[in-house]
Amino acid sequence: MEHAYQYSWIIPFVPLPIPILIGIGLLLFPTATKNLRRMWAFPNILLLSIVMIFSIDLSIQQINGSYIYQYVWSWTINNDFSFEFGYFIDSLTSIMSILITTVGIFVLIYSDNYMSHDQGYLRFFAYMSLFNTSMLGLVTSSNLIQIYIFWELVGMCSYLLIGFWFTRPAAANACQKAFVTNRIGDFGLLLGILGFYWITGSFEFQXLFEIFNNLIYNNEVHLLFVTLCASLLFAGAVAKSAQFPLHVWLPDAMXGPTPISALIHAATMVATGIFLVARLLPLFIVIPYIMNLISLIGIITVLLGATLPLAQKXIKRGLAYSTMSQLGYMMLALGMGSYRAALFHLITHAYSKALLFLGSGSIIHSMEAVVGYSPEKSQNMVLMGGLRKHAPITQIAFLIGTLSLCGIPPLACFWSKDEILSDSWLYSPIFAIIAWSTAGLTAFYMFRIYLLTFEGHLNIYFQKYSGKKSSSFYSIKLWGKEEQKMINRNFRLFPLLTMNKNEKPYTIGGNVKKRALITNFGYKEAFSYPHESDNTMLFPMLILVLFTLFVGAIAIPLNQEGMHLDILSKLXXPSINXLHKNSNDFEDSYQFLTNATFSVSIAGFGIFTAFLLYKPFYSSLLNLNLLNSFSKKGPKRIFLDKIIYLIYDWSYXRGYIDTFYSISLTKGIRGLAELTHFFDRRVIDGITNGVGITSFFVGEGIKYXGG
């Protein structure tokens, strides 16, 4: 056992040779390295698999003994200051290591096929290896300085991967937005680290917690300053985990390749903020107002993330907002002191969201056979529909991931989300009402994504790329902005949006297949059609389906004879849980079934509403009299229309938050820069030049007067 812990320092460095070797190969043997580029996927996956096996071994030992192991090397700079660096192994480290490596392996296998056509294949795998190294280094860090170093490396890798296709303006702008937004949080994190070092004189976690608790107990610190430092630490987590108000980078980050979206949203970048708060929870929990702040930010993010996807048309952006909402649930749980529930939801959400993003990548990959390489079209849900016929395996996998995120038993997210929802009643009834309501909204918008993508007919064939409408039906927009003439123009809630007809698709060679004939409402023409992805992409999705089905069993919260399956509590013990002081205080069967029935009912209502509004659209057009009967004018209908327009505008405009930042911050900073430039050129330079000119004329005058 001791040997496993002693060699744990190697965990972050195992994947590191790959980017180094790729760089050396491209520098010394560029032609051979590029010709053999597909070879690099295997050692990448192999090295990460070694780390996964090592992490599983550590977790087994943690379950058996709940050990905390720390090894520190000291570097003495002078007699007054020494820098210590090392590694810290506990249950949180082992859980995060397993999460990073398992999801990372599946994403790498998937990426081998997904990125095979891309000229940046080698660069992508080098960035991915460096990303995994940075995350593993972060979770094994023994002090705040190491955390900050790897924190910055994670941010750098995300910048490189989000802007992987940097020639596309959308990707270039997205990586800059992510970088700048995270710099705000990183600056706060650095100030918070320095503040706590000034208070305690230590960066090491165990020494920091012990010294700080003694200072608080003896009332030897200024509470306002401590609260400020803790808030600055939390600001770093807010930015990285896309919490309000620093969440604006996350939807735009979808401009990167889909595999990296899966990794960022499941187990790497957005998980770092949750990890940081979980790691520093012994510090936060003794500061009176910080836990309230964490839970408040969490519940605001939950609500915001559940309302913004309601009118999004890009499939990846809708999933990005769902990630934001689920991260809000985790942050809410940490703010409530429910450490175990937050960690449980982090695990279950990671596998479910990885499955959904890989599924969306499979969808986008198949749609590119129809629309060519055009992200605005290949990711547009309203041009999809009917993909269940063309990609049945992807459809089943995506449906399982969707049901899990909705909280339907016995899938993974049901167990963790239900635990957070149950704990919220013990913390605050207001927060509980918001959390339960957003659970229904989650089910609604997730099934909206599923129905628009897989059910009905392939909507792309209702409009030609030239912009000429092949069917009058395609004049319909979502929420009734514009409609077909046969229907009353005030009817709302159609699940279609018009496409951007000004953008040309770019066909990828060898990626287009032809169908002899497709008949859509009497319209006949030979079309390209979507197709199921290759086995290399389907295999990791099927493995993630198994994780989504069974990973919830590690922490089923029942404490009955013969049903004690709660492995997570053994792994996380001793852990902080302010809501359940007694470690044996779990739900009995009746309480669990009551809460579960209520949560499933709310999710079922959201799914039912989505089916009503987003059922296959063209079949509903067969009964135009019924549709027109719904659209009759009246005071209630006018009021409902106003509510619908309000919801649509709120969601489509991203809650006006990006607009507010653009006006108040971007334009304000640019205006300040222009004012500074004007002041520098006209005033500062004017004074300098004026002094010079004055000296010249005075000298000339003296020269003239003196003869």
Curated annotation (Swiss-Prot):
Its EC number is 7.1.1.-. It catalyses: a plastoquinone + NADH + (n+1) H(+)(in) = a plastoquinol + NAD(+) + n H(+)(out); a plastoquinone + NADPH + (n+1) H(+)(in) = a plastoquinol + NADP(+) + n H(+)(out). The keyword Nucleotide-binding does not apply. It comes from the Eukaryota. GO terms for molecular function: NADH dehydrogenase (ubiquinone) activity; quinone binding. Keywords: Chloroplast, Membrane, NAD, NADP, Plastid, Plastoquinone, Quinone, Thylakoid, Translocase, Transmembrane, Transmembrane helix, Transport. One of its GO terms (cellular component) is chloroplast thylakoid membrane. It is found in: Plastid, Chloroplast thylakoid membrane. It is an enzyme of class 7 (translocase). It holds the Pfam family Proton_antipo_M. GO terms for biological process: ATP synthesis coupled electron transport; electron transport coupled proton transport. NCBIfam families: NDH_I_L, PRK06590.1. Belongs to the complex I subunit 5 family. NDH is composed of at least 16 different subunits, 5 of which are encoded in the nucleus. This is NAD(P)H-quinone oxidoreductase subunit 5, chloroplastic. It comes from Malvaviscus arboreus (Turk's cap). The lineage of its organism: Eukaryota, Viridiplantae, Streptophyta, Embryophyta, Tracheophyta. The gene is ndhF.
